Amino acid sequence: MNDSAKTATIYHNPRCSTSRNTLKLIEDAGIEPTVVKYLETPPSHDGLRKLLDDAGLRPSEAIRKKEALFKELGLATASEDELLDAMVANPILIERPIVVTDRGTVLARPYEKVREIL
């Protein structure tokens, strides 16, 4: 029996090479994913919390610490809840891509990590 993923959703930033490479791997696996351009349609607070929980990640593990806004907002000493709030308010801070399939959820960094759930 084939236990490969049948469906996929990618939280995608087309300007990010890692996100583009991840999308290509999904498509090369024969899956036509749902593409969520999260900068245009960001997840809700509860939606982002669920994505991170499903991936086994804390907000501090899924926030873009090198993004200028991270420093501008003084987030280095923020709590996990404060980081999540900042990510919802400023989706550019969300590390990408996050991929959800019927086999699990991963932050696909490096992009090959998506193979774990395909």
Enumerate the language-model features and the residues they cover.
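Local sequence-structure signature of Cys/Sec-based thiol-disulfide redox active-site neighborhoods
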Residues: 2-29, 33-38
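Thiol/selenol-based redox catalytic cores and closely related redox-interacting motifs
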Residues: 38-118
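Intrinsic-disorder/low-complexity regions
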Residues: 1-2, 89
